[in-house]
Swiss-Prot record:
Gene Ontology CC entries for this record: cytoplasm
Residues carrying N6-carboxylysine: K225
Protein location: Cytoplasm
Positions bound to ATP: G116, T117, N118, G119, K120, T121, T122
Reaction equations catalysed: UDP-N-acetyl-alpha-D-muramoyl-L-alanyl-D-glutamate + meso-2,6-diaminopimelate + ATP = UDP-N-acetyl-alpha-D-muramoyl-L-alanyl-gamma-D-glutamyl-meso-2,6-diaminopimelate + ADP + phosphate + H(+)
Protein keywords: ATP-binding, Cell cycle, Cell division, Cell shape, Cell wall biogenesis/degradation, Cytoplasm, Ligase, Magnesium, Nucleotide-binding, Peptidoglycan synthesis
Name the UniProt record assigns to this protein: UDP-N-acetylmuramoyl-L-alanyl-D-glutamate--2,6-diaminopimelate ligase
Broad class of enzyme this protein falls into: ligase
GO molecular function: ATP binding; magnesium ion binding; UDP-N-acetylmuramoylalanyl-D-glutamate-2,6-diaminopimelate ligase activity
Organism field: Buchnera aphidicola subsp. Schizaphis graminum (strain Sg)
EC nos: 6.3.2.13
Amino acid sequence: MKKNNLKYILFPWIKNTPQKKFSNLSLDSRKLTSKDVFIAIKGTKKDGNDFIFEAVKKRVVAILSETKEKKKHGEINYINNIPILSFFKLSEKISNLAARVYKEPAKTLKIIGVTGTNGKTTVTQLINQWSELLGKKIATMGTLGNGFYNALKTTKNTTSSAIDIQSFLHIAAKKKINLVTMEVSSHGLVQNRVKNIPFYIGIFTNLTQDHLDYHKNMKQYESAKWSFFSQHKIKKIILNANDKYAKKWLRKLSDKYTIAVTIQNEKQKKYSTKWINATGIKYNVNSTDVEFESSWGQGILSTCLIGYFNIQNLLLSFASMLEMNYKLSDLINTSIQLQPILGRMQKFDVFGKPKVIIDYAHTPDALKKALNAIKSYYKKKIWCIFGCGGERDQTKRPLMGSISEKIADRVIITNDNPRNENQNKIIKEIVQGCIKKEKIIIIPNREKAISSTFFKANIDDIIFISGKGHENQQIIKNKIINYSDQKVVIKLLEKKI
């Protein structure tokens, strides 16, 4: 990539910027080179301004330092001939700056952003699968990683940094990809990571309790999600209008192009530009048939995905495909070929052994919906294995304990990612929500919890393992341990018992 000119990148926000050539922007002082510009902003845990001298030692081209004082904006100081430019509300402009560095890649792409508490990964991956089935190559960013369908590189966050996003879009544009799906988290919205991105389609899945350690209350959490539709450029908005928040937003978005997606709730269509409504659902042994009516016509979608909530996810994906002008008949004919997403209601079924389902459900609402979905398909005993993450929203722990105890026949409480929090404290807080303590088994070691349950369960039983989904690591204190629920289950299923 050609070198960038600092003066051009910062115009018109800072006047008298020195003419400096540089290669990249960086938020991480550990990864700096002498060709970079260091962006020093306050993060959730650390403040980049504390690492300015480290950047100076690495002889960076320049440093942009976020200031809280408006009057200091545009001030330029020098240390060892390295300019340090004060920038008021810098974090809000990083997306713009990075877009300039990477030559505005979003302008050549159609970008679909998906936000919501649960379902972001499933919706993006269903769009990816469907596009591939119908002959279109697609790039994606999200929880499972960034990259191209079936070739993803693991990432730390659901929504990458503003700089990494623009870098990825630049790569996608160079490879002549013209469609990108992106999971948009509430953290990503609050931290302005997608601020400069023009979305062709914005999708909302649902809003339920999660991340209250970060957002403090549901009002702030709702505000973060709503900002996606109220403060960002989105050409077409698709809402799960069965959700109570979406119903409210649909009315507030009356001047926008909206698509209301509902299940047995046709009232919402009068508030939207276009609509899809599922009029009937038939659960079969290995599939589900979804009868629908819509602005595009009517028909039946068949799917092998498990659960009512996955019907919602399917319909949201369906709406986005229709909005990208795919033929209704082609989508109907290929819907049955869509496969379950890694770690999302992923079924393991071997003759003569208990059935196992692995899911990422780590919120009260997701756990409840997953367990109810299993109950609607299978009438035998349900064993539920789950834990809660450390250093995360503590208020959901007893709620998840209560939900699991009410729906499952036996509940095995174990570790998730305890991080630096005491594992026994986490487990105790989960148990506080349980009334029927005789249904509860506590096995902190996750692998032992799964294997113990596997050998206790009858072959007709269902073992539901929740919380980690696709993850292949476990965080205990400051150690990251290689661990995968899938690998543990496959190992058990392959054993000759």
